[in-house]
Amino acid sequence: MTTNIHDQRILILDFGSQYTQLVARRIREIGVYCELWSWDVEESDIRDFNPDGIILSGGPESVTEENSPRAPQYVFDSGVPVFGVCYGMQTMAEQLGGKVATSTEREFGYAAVQVTGESALFKDLEATQDVWMSHGDKVVEIPSDFVKIAETETCPYAAMANEEKKYYGVQFHPEVTHTKNGMKMLENFVLNVCGCEGLWTSASIIEDAVARIKEQVGDDEVILGLSGGVDSSVVAMLAHRAIGDKLTCVFVDNGLLRLNEADQVMEMFGNKFGLNIVHVNAEQRFLDALEGESDPETKRKIIGHVFVDIFDEESKKLKNAKWLAQGTIYPDVIESAASKTGKAHVIKSHHNVGGLPDDMEMGLVEPLRELFKDEVRKIGLELGLPYNMLYRHPFPGPGLGVRVLGEIKKEYCDLLRRADAIFIEELHNADLYNKVSQAFTVFLPVRSVGVMGDGRKYDWVVSLRAVETIDFMTAHWAHLPYDFLGKVSNRIINEVNGISRVVYDISGKPPATIEWE
């Protein structure tokens, strides 16, 4: 019998913290299903969701300001355990009779917290804990039925608890890795206080997804746009496991892929895994549509429109295809809901976030829409996809279309593909590939004088780009060894006829973006 992986669940109310999705990912890592909703959710929605516990996230607002966000009163009337983090602790204190004040000393960074009392939250943890603080306000008076369970030198109430009602608040962020035992605190809350078990595993997620796809589509056929990226690849494997040859994958080679990528996709999914794939070689069609266009945003739109047109044409050839499978993941759903309503809300509503035509008369199959990217990768491994494919660096949707600056020509793409392949190969050879978050090569539409043998040449310039980042919102340029960069440069100039100069991009984000276009 299939495990009901949604049987136990945690609700996270989002007050706007940059770390809120990280809280959700941590709960999933513990093995428990959770959803992320906006703080101003309706009481009826919480009641219908029936959570085993509620977490109130951090946020940028001040509890002391008029009209700042508050948790719905039902959170405290529902009888379920509640865990307030940073702003979540402050609003809990304020709403239950305590006091919050703006602090003269803003605490940001590492802090040593002294545990001052026994609590289920700090079970099996030592008296001093290294934590990550990020707050201006602080609780100066806790509600009368709470006790202090931790403090710092500058924060008298670093944590508070009402053990009887199972309410807990911490002024720090247990979800970030900087809080050394933060994961243990979250485990104590989710597993011990809320009584959840670890039902949410890669194997059980796959089992659930396969059963749902079978139930949803019955004997109908399904079509999927397979790009070779992580999300569509995992959807392909799940759907194939569920319905076999009733799945048709459409792989569009737009001429903007990495070196040999089209062959690799066909070899892996067609030959190795035996999926039914329609391979559309549309390089010339994309190049014709892009001819003369140099504006980055317009290039993106053209690439998107041509892909949609081709996919539409191919889907019409499959008369029995009633369903469209998409690689929508949970952050897409949250972002899509937030952009439409101003708030992240329930996962069940269907947003077509893939940009495919609205007049496509097909049902949507989205087996990943509850999953974060790290979860998608883990189930990909479980399904037999290679590690190197699942954990390779991000590649933009428009591909080389935004890595060839200015107008796109086949000559430029071919040169860039070969130069980029050398850079990536050398990163692997030097054991540096997994030490940077993203690395790639950019083609610059400018010529530079070079010397080859006794002759001069006047050829193109490429830039190498490598960054280190945690969340891709900000990034540092990677300080790769000079000897390594020299080796890559020499190989590119000697092996790629048409490139005379290699430069290295040392811009951080901000002010620069990671991609050049």
Swiss-Prot record:
Q: State the Gene Ontology terms under molecular function.
A: ATP binding; GMP synthase activity
GO cellular component, alphabetical, reads: cytosol
The residue ranges of the Glutamine amidotransferase type-1 domain are 9-199
Q: Residue limits of the GMPS ATP-PPase domain? A: 200-392
Q: Which InterPro entries match?
A: Class_I_gatase-like (IPR029062), GATASE (IPR017926), GMP_synth_C (IPR001674), GMP_synth_GATase (IPR004739), GMP_synthase (IPR022955), GMPS_ATP_PPase_dom (IPR025777), NAD/GMP_synthase (IPR022310), Rossmann-like_a/b/a_fold (IPR014729)
List the active-site residues: C86 (nucleophile), H173, E175
As its record notes, the protein acts as a catalyst of: XMP + L-glutamine + ATP + H2O = GMP + L-glutamate + AMP + diphosphate + 2 H(+)
Residues annotated as binding ATP are S227, G228, G229, V230, D231, S232, S233
* Pathway(s) per entry: Purine metabolism; GMP biosynthesis; GMP from XMP (L-Gln route): step 1/1
Q: Broadest EC class?
A: ligase
**Known EC number(s)?**
6.3.5.2
Q: Which UniProt keywords apply?
A: ATP-binding, Glutamine amidotransferase, GMP biosynthesis, Ligase, Nucleotide-binding, Purine biosynthesis
- Keyword match Ligase: yes
- Top-level taxon of the source organism: Bacteria
Q: Name the PROSITE patterns on file.
A: GATASE_TYPE_1 (PS51273), GMPS_ATP_PPASE (PS51553)
Which NCBIfam families does UniProt cross-reference here? guaA_Cterm, guaA_Nterm, PRK00074.1
Database matches in HAMAP family: GMP_synthase
Q: How does it assemble?
A: Homodimer.
What this protein is reported to do is described as: Catalyzes the synthesis of GMP from XMP.
What name appears for this protein in its UniProt entry?
GMP synthase [glutamine-hydrolyzing]
Q: Which organism is it from?
A: Aliivibrio fischeri (strain ATCC 700601 / ES114) (Vibrio fischeri)
